[in-house]
Amino acid sequence: VKTLKTLEEFLGKKAFAVIPVELGGFNTLAAVDVAARRGIPIVDADGAGRAVPEVHLKVYTLDDVPLAPMVAADISAENIVLIEQTRDSQAAEKITRTLAAEWNQTVYTARRILTGKQVKTSPVPNTLSTSIRIGTLLRKALDPLRAILKETKGFLLFEGTVAEAEHETKSGFTWTTLELDGANEDRNSSFKLKAKNEFLIAHKDGKLAAIAPDIITTVNAETGRCSSAERVKKGDKLAVIGIPAPSKWRRQKGLRLWKEVMQRSGITENYAPIERLTKRKSS
């Protein structure tokens, strides 16, 4: 709330609504909380249509919506930084990542000022309502995993048990490598995932199974509830699901932005749509 207030004071304007910066995890709920506390609407949309590893990796970047001016604060809001201008969105990413490293990996921000016209065209639409439907399925469906795959038009990539889990925090990121031994239909196979905060690439038996920007998610094999990369541990029984990325990310400009991030993350494989990589459908 303080970050938004500081940004409003700098601009001399009031916010009419809040949009989550990305979908999934704490960042979505933080936006809901701010909107509720301020008594203003939250838009049924977000800036990525998925969780992303870097601040500038938003569809707004594709639409040339500047990241700055931006306000960043630590978890207690005792330290508040106003960033009036940056060279580009990637420069802003480096600044906020440095702050995250100093502030125990947590930074609250208010950024990306959109006009009413931009709100209608730039964010990925209907993502909050989709999340609510998925939450309902997790609570009520007899087979939550299959229900989620059907709702998201996703793919079941693998089922198995975590044999190895490596986590390392450096430069403001949590790097994760997982190796799974197969179960059920995958009992004779192995699976490997790599993450930079978010899962970026997956291989089954050494062959590419999924790659960002398509969404790769690990979930509890029985309940369908998400197990985020940094929390997965050896012995966990997981299902790995893949979901096609929002259309903006699959266009040339979106893929080019992701390619830069992947190369910085040590991943050199070219993008291939998940539906071409697997024939194992949602049901």
Predicted regions and their residues:
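Oxyanion-binding "anion nests"
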Residues: 132-183
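Short glycine/serine/threonine-rich phosphate/pyrophosphate-binding segments
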Residues: 21-32, 49-54
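Flexible, glycine/charged-enriched surface loops at secondary-structure junctions
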Residues: 15, 103-115, 144-158, 247-253
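A structural-propensity feature for long, helix-poor, extended segments
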Residues: 57-99
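Glycine-rich oxoanion-binding loops at beta->alpha junctions
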Residues: 1-16
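A short, small-residue-rich loop immediately preceding and capping a beta-strand
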Residues: 14-22, 41-43
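C-terminal non-catalytic interaction/assembly regions of soluble proteins
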Residues: 166-283
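Short, acidic/small-residue loops that bind anionic groups at enzyme active sites
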Residues: 37-56
